[in-house]
Regions:
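Extracellular S/T/G-rich loop segment that most often corresponds to the catalytic His/Ser-adjacent loop
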Residues: 82-164
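C-terminal subdomain of the subtilisin-like protease fold in secreted/lumenal serine endopeptidases
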Residues: 171-248
Length: 391
């Protein structure tokens, strides 16, 4: 910001956007946080220039961008809605939780969703941002001391810190979309708060949580690029030995996509269609829409037919009873593209960067080692050697 930012009615801060654009468009940065933007709620019929410009840059350079959703959550009606550019489809919109420990909730000031469709689930999640009962402590260089503050502006970089921490810990090169998918995949849900308030849930502050597997859980990560009209078959890690417990399947799929700012309804130019085949190992042709419309949208809210197929982030956990038969289950993922709502030929569509995280959990069952023995092709994430220095 400069002393003249916002003068002469320039409340959209276009001069600030140009400076941010010039830095990020250099391609030198893979991680960035924005705790700044126009002070107004998003609208459904028009994409703000901040959102459109930054979405294109993130897709072009593969940047993991976290954006604070704003601090007007106490306002009435649409005035409490998230603020641009946190409605980006290629970034993580971060709200604030009121506590860092248990019994947490949405901080009252944290702006709420929903976003547009596509980009309906906003905020993407929340993380500790401070409250009257538990301030967020940070260093104030002007005072030269630690002060207690609160706001989504502090929550947003904390979420980015977790993702960057995973990249620093991992000797396995994970792309930024995989880091985003891991954050969403391990978000802690709450029955007390709706998705419009906390998104997918509370993000972890500990990067180790995102890459550690408990004994009763097996998690695999698929990531890379996918050509249009091609498909990826992602095997789900499932034991071939009998067990008598209920189990839970959790999956998260994230992509980065070019956007079409002139068409808010058809804003994303790419999408993924996911088909769940629960008994692929038995040559069973039955399929299931695991990431169905109801997994993304509230049933009482109208949404476009098959709109979830154009979302950039899909996430769901589903519990199965002990007598459910699964045999070598897989997800089939197909990439499709459009331009101004029109179909795009395969030769003109760019390759799509994607990441999918899949977890299976069976309580009181040594699932991790069973999966390691069955799928010898799987490689655990290698961790960098850490050296502790005594002070």
């Amino acid at each position: 910001l400069s002393p003249t930012s916002g003068d002469n009615g320039n409340w959209d801060l276009f001069d600030v956007l140009k400076k941010i654009q010039s830095v990020l468009d250099s391609g030198d940065y893979k991680f960035a946080n924005l705790s700044i933007g126009p002070h107004l709620p998003i609208g459904d019929d028009e994409v703000h220039v901040w959102t459109a410009v930054l979405d294109q840059i993130c897709a072009k350079h593969g940047i993991l961008l976290t954006v604070a959703v704003g601090n007007d959550g106490n306002e009435d009606g649409d005035a409490a809605r998230i603020q641009p550019p946190s409605d980006m489809v290629n970034a993580l919109a971060i709200g604030a939780a009121d506590r860092s420990g248990e019994k947490w909730g949405r901080a009252p000031y944290s702006c709420i969703g929903p976003g547009r469709s596509p980009g309906f689930v906003k905020p993407d999640g929340v993380i500790f941002g401070g409250s009257d009962d538990e301030p967020f402590y940070t260093y104030n260089p002007l005072l030269g001391s630690i002060v207690g503050v609160q706001g989504t502006s502090y929550a947003s970089p904390l979420a980015l810190r977790t993702a960057a921490g995973v990249a620093a810990l991992s000797g396995t090169p994970l792309n930024t979309i995989a880091l985003k998918a891991l954050l969403v995949h391990h978000a802690e849900t709450s029955r007390k708060y709706s998705r419009e308030h906390i998104g997918w849930g509370r993000f972890s502050e500990d990067p180790n949580v995102l890459i550690d597997c408990p004994n009763d859980t097996a998690t695999v990560i698929y990531y890379g690029s996918l050509a249009k009209n091609k498909y990826l078959r992602a095997p789900i890690p499932f034991p071939d030995v009998p067990f008598d417990e209920a189990f839970e399947l959790t999956a998260t799929l994230c992509i980065q996509t070019p956007v079409d700012p002139e068409h808010s309804v058809n804003y994303t130019r790419a999408g993924m269609q996911v088909t769940f085949r629960p008994r692929f190992g038995l040559d069973d042709t039955d399929t299931d829409d695991f990431f169905g419309q109801k997994s993304q949208y509230k049933t009482e809210r109208e949404c476009r037919s098959e709109g979830h197929k154009w979302e950039t982030c899909l996430h769901r956990s589903k519990k199965f009873s002990a007598d459910t038969l699964l045999s070598d289950p897989v997800f089939d993922i197909r990439y499709h593209a459009r331009d101004s709502s029109r179909h795009v030929k395969g030769v003109s569509a760019p390759d799509m960067q994607y990441a999918m995280v899949i977890s299976v959990r069976v309580k009181d069952f040594d699932l991790y080692n069973v999966i390691r023995q069955r799928y010898t092709i799987l490689n655990p994430i290698q961790l960098r050697t850490q050296i502790s220095l005594d002070t």
